[in-house]
Design a protein with these regions (language model features):
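Beta-sheet repeat architectures centered on beta-propellers
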Residues: 1-109, 115-128, 240-366
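Short loop/turn segments immediately following the C-termini of beta-strands
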Residues: 96, 135, 175, 220, ...
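A short loop-to-beta-strand structural motif that recurs across blades of beta-propeller domains
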Residues: 98, 139-141, 222, 318
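Beta-propeller and closely related beta-pinwheel folds
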Residues: 51, 57, 66-78, 105-119, ...
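Hydrophobic or amphipathic alpha-helical targeting/insertion segments
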Residues: 122-152, 172
Length: 366
């Protein structure tokens, strides 16, 4: 009996249409098998909910028909960004025009409103400050437990759409290839002299990003790497230049220190999601096997926090925990599909000879 392992990567055959090579919600896990992508179990919800509006006497306020007037207590919207380990060690999400903190039990607290919805935000945080950049007007907010949510109004900070945190300072993307560094431990204070320019090549600055104590300045065609040198204004120096850039502000993420991109680890498996929200598609790269598969549950932000992997849905105002003990998507059955490779005489090592296949046996663990 000839054993054919169905582990060949999909989307590579030139003899089949791409839509006949689909791998959906499955990824290679063992030498001869695939594993189901985990289910999505609700962790926190920002779906509109209502409670009766009451007057000063605790009596229900009614409309002209005598029905109680309801007020929204959990506003939410499209996922715009999710960040772990913000002030007080909490999880924070911008959902629609609302900023929420979420504790380890999934309880959410409304903090304030963020402009420029539904565009994604870029956030950075230390133990006491959460900085949110919108690319709109206002373009920068700072949240602290003591002072709440306020707009950053420093005249030395021009319009920005991304921020990073490095060595007790916040670094902001600026127009014309510039970036600016905040005061030590104060993301809302900018000094006039603390500007620098990514100037190795003339491509514009698309994103600032920190990783492994280095600052990455991503342009359209190049990337500059800077480090904290402690000298000069700002106290950073360029270390290297890479001849690759990125396609957009939200197309960068990291896995284990290494379109819109979200990267994450799950049960020692590494994944990178390439997200196309408008088309309702996610192409996922499984780093371990170096193969691709598709996902059909539209999550756009994924973080590790509270010893969980948490994913925010693109539109339904919920955050989910990924759970290998549950193979449903928000309570609905998950469709899984694996198109087998083309069975040909070449695969069976019989050249161009005619074949008759009497029996095919598949092993499926339900």
């Amino acid at each position: 009996m000839r054993v054919m392992a169905p582990l060949e990567s999909s989307y590579q055959s030139t003899r089949l249409d791409a839509n006949r090579q689909q791998t959906l919600n499955l990824f290679p896990n063992t030498l001869r098998g695939y594993r189901q992508f985990p289910g999505h179990v609700t962790f926190a919800s920002f779906q509109s909910a209502g409670e009766a509006l009451t007057d000063t006497n605790a009596s229900a306020v009614t409309d002209s028909d005598g029905d109680p007037v309801q007020v929204s207590i959990n506003p939410g919207g499209a996922d715009r960004g999710l960040i772990a380990d913000g002030p007080n060690g909490l999880l924070y999400q911008v959902t629609g025009s609302a900023l929420y903190s979420i504790d380890s039990s999934g309880n959410a607290l409304f903090i304030g409103e963020i402009s420029n919805t539904p565009n994604p935000v870029v956030m950075a945080a230390d133990a006491t400050q959460l900085i949110i950049t919108t690319g709109g007007t206002p373009d920068v907010y700072v949240y602290t437990v003591a002072a709440g949510l306020v707009v950053v109004t420093d005249d030395d900070l021009l319009t920005t759409s991304s921020v990073a945190f490095l060595d007790s300072r916040f670094i902001y993307q600026q127009p014309d290839g510039y970036f600016v560094v905040s005061a030590l431990n104060d993301g809302a204070t900018i000094a006039t002299l603390d500007f620098a320019q990514a100037e190795a090549l003339p491509d514009d600055l698309v994103r600032v990003f920190s990783l492994n104590q280095l600052l990455y300045l991503f342009g359209e065609t190049t990337t500059e790497i800077w480090f904290t040198s402690g000298t000069g204004r700002p106290p950073l120096s360029r270390q290297a230049v890479l001849q690759q850039g990125i396609c957009g502000t939200y197309a960068v993420d990291s896995i284990d220190a290494t379109a819109r991109v979200s990267a994450y680890s799950l049960h020692q498996e590494n994944f990178v999601d390439f997200i196309f929200s408008d088309q309702g598609q996610i192409w996922c790269y499984h780093v371990t096997s170096q193969t691709w598969f598709e996902k059909d549950f539209m999550t756009t932000s994924i973080v590790h926090h509270y010893d969980l992997v948490l994913a925010a849905h693109s539109a339904n105002k919920k955050i989910y925990r990924l759970d290998f003990a549950n193979y449903q998507q928000d309570g609905a059955n998950m469709t899984r599909r694996k198109d087998l490779p083309l069975i040909s005489s070449e695969v069976m090592d019989v050249g161009g000879a005619e074949m008759v296949i009497d029996k095919i046996k598949l092993h499926v663990d339900a």
